[in-house]
Structure formats: C-alpha cells, structure tokens
C-alpha cells in the first residue's frame, strides 16, 4: 500500500462543506468519486481540515491509502480530468506510510477577505465580504495581535467546551491591505496549530466591531479572556474565508515538481537562467 498526498484547491460556493455527507455534494465526495473513476478503488479520502459550506481552499491537503500503481503524474492528470471545475488537485506527492493529513499537520493558515469599495464587485461576491463603511484597520490589527500565543479560544467557537479542549496556539496574525481593480481589499490572515469550529469567522466578526468603533481593543481582549461566546461579535459569512495552507514537518511528503507533472513524471533539469527576447 502507498500513501498519496493531495494538494487541493476549491471554490466552496456550491459545496455543502468539505466533509462527506450522504446524498449531499461535498468536496470529499467529489474527490472520492474521481479517485474511484481513475483507479477503480473505493477509498476514503482524509482531509487535513474541515471547511464549512461556502468556505474555499487554496491549500487544503488530503491523503489516501492506495494499492494503485499509477505514477504521481498520472494520478494528478487523471483526478483533474474526473473532477468538477470547482475543485482541482494542484499537486500530488508520495508520503511516508504513516502520514496523516490531519494528525501530522503542525500549522494551518486561513485568510478572510473584505472588499471595502463603496459598491460591491460581482466577481468577488463569492470570495469576499463586502463592507462599504469606514474601518479602523490599525485598531483591528492591534486587537488581532492579542490572539497570538497560547489561549483558550472558547469565546470564538460554537464547539461545546465540555466536548473538547478549546486551547489553541496562534503562531502569527496580520492584516494586509491590497489594491485590486482599483478596489481596497483587506486580508485578515491567521496561522495556528489548529482552529476550532467557526473560530476564524467569529474572530473576524468581532474584529469588525472593533473596526467600526463599536468595541475597543481592550474589550476585544476581555472577550478572549472571558471565554464566553455571548461576549463576541456575530459570525462573519463563510464566503470570505479561504484555507490557504497546511504545513507539516519536513520529510513527510515528496511533492512532484511542476515540470515532472507536465512531462509525465520525467525529471527535467531547469536552466540556471532564462532570458526572453521579443
């Protein structure tokens, strides 16, 4: 048996979340159907993280235990040929035998996108939350920094504290301002060892209260310390959220190089320099 790792990207708009559900369209279900069509194997695909309906991914990771002898390049091309257009396999890799997409992960990264233009852009309606009002980004960034380190994030989850630990370690946070098509976009980015259910969306919803002047930075800190969901702001809509990366200790996965995928897994040496002349 082999353990194959998959790097996935998907538009979550038309999926009822990532995790398999009976008779409902999910990311896991789409990948398992494509895998069976390619290999004639019925295998369970294991995802690194669960995403809700409407949430996107550009760096989701999955693994599958398989007996197939297909090359990695064939798996990459074959899965993409069988998958719908709103989910793709960006890369494939050979993983160590005991690799687990979820339990081997040491870091997850998310980005929440806010479109701050006066009028929404239709092309962004499924990828960014539109907010036309004024936001105090400095106050939002200051409040966001309070989350870094190891804390009990019970105030920012719908999970029942008695069911599981709500302590997580936030490695870093930042708010990046970008201009795209003459529009001002805010990207709220967070990295942690793991995230709780709805955690990022609840953090963003509370940060928006800070940005709008309806909550102070100190009050935001009190929400975190209070560990009470009722103190936090509303849950931000799902469509602005993207899982951007899942990270692992080195040596667990040998990802295929881009040229190997293009050349059918034949290694091609890249030139040391490249000059393009018109």
UniProtKB/Swiss-Prot annotation:
Gene3D superfamilies: Pseudouridine synthase I, catalytic domain, C-terminal subdomain, Pseudouridine synthase I, catalytic domain, N-terminal subdomain. One of its GO terms (biological process) is tRNA pseudouridine synthesis. Substrate binds at residue 110. Disulfide bonds: none annotated. It catalyses: uridine(38/39/40) in tRNA = pseudouridine(38/39/40) in tRNA. The keyword tRNA processing applies. Keywords: Isomerase, tRNA processing. Coiled coil: none annotated. The active site is at residue 52. GO terms for molecular function: RNA binding; tRNA pseudouridine(38-40) synthase activity. Belongs to the tRNA pseudouridine synthase TruA family. Formation of pseudouridine at positions 38, 39 and 40 in the anticodon stem and loop of transfer RNAs. This is tRNA pseudouridine synthase A. It comes from Chloroflexus aggregans (strain MD-66 / DSM 9485). The gene is truA.
